[in-house]
């Protein structure tokens, strides 16, 4: 069902998660609508999060098996380098080991969301980044499975703005993690 008002990227995910919780589903899946991610990976995502409530989510990683999952599908090299750089900064500052922090394929274990304040997270494109950080603070795992993605000729205008926001948020998360600053929305 189409939204009457544009809720933003994060707003749409929150709507999906709230709907799924209200219906008492066990899992929810988010897949970008740009056709880059193959829905055939959905059963693998759900398999990874089912039956283990220490796992908050599972993502499809284009880089878990090196760069083949990204480059074979036609990922532009500037996107690949940006993804690797931003994910590496996130991992270094927050002591994590993600391979693809910018994926458009997520499976959510709803058991872990029942008492989480995810509705306070951004409605924008950095929802995934904030969600990932919230799980780090709660000591809930986010697993990754290897996937391949397909890229067309589409162009996006948000790359630089997204990258800057992601970088600033990662510094902010580091400061919160080190208890230098406190922001309640991540509790």
Mark where each language-model region is.
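Residue-level signature of catalytic and energy-coupling elements of molecular machines
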Residues: 16, 34, 109, 135, ...
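Hydrophobic residues at beta-strand termini and immediately following loops
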Residues: 1-3, 145
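An aromatic- and histidine-rich active-site surface loop
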Residues: 35, 44, 129-130
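Acidic, glycine-rich active-site loops and adjacent beta-strand->loop/helix elements
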Residues: 33-36, 151
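Hydrophobic helical membrane-anchoring modules
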Residues: 93-96, 119-187
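Active-site loop/turn elements of alpha/beta-hydrolase fold enzymes
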Residues: 33, 62, 147
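Acceptor/aglycone-binding surface of glycosyltransferases and processive sugar-polymer synthases
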Residues: 3-22, 27, 39-125, 152-161, ...
């Amino acid at each position: 069902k189409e939204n009457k008002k544009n809720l933003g990227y994060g707003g749409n995910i929150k709507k999906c998660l709230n709907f799924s919780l209200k219906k008492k589903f066990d899992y929810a899946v988010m897949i970008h609508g740009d056709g880059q991610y193959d829905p055939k990976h959905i059963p693998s995502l759900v398999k990874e999060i089912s039956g283990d409530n220490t796992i908050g989510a599972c993502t499809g990683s284009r880089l878990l098996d090196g760069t083949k999952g990204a480059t074979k599908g036609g990922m532009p090299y500037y996107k690949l380098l940006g993804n690797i750089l931003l994910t590496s900064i996130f991992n270094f500052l927050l002591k994590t080991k993600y391979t693809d922090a910018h994926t458009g394929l997520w499976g959510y274990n709803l058991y872990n969301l029942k008492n989480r304040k995810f509705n306070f997270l951004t409605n924008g494109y950095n929802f995934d980044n904030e969600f990932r950080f919230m799980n780090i603070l709660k000591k809930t795992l986010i697993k990754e499975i290897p996937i391949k993605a397909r890229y067309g000729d589409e162009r996006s205008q948000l790359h630089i703005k997204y990258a800057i926001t992601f970088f600033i948020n990662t510094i902010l998360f580091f400061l919160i993690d080190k208890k230098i600053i406190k922001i309640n929305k991540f509790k």
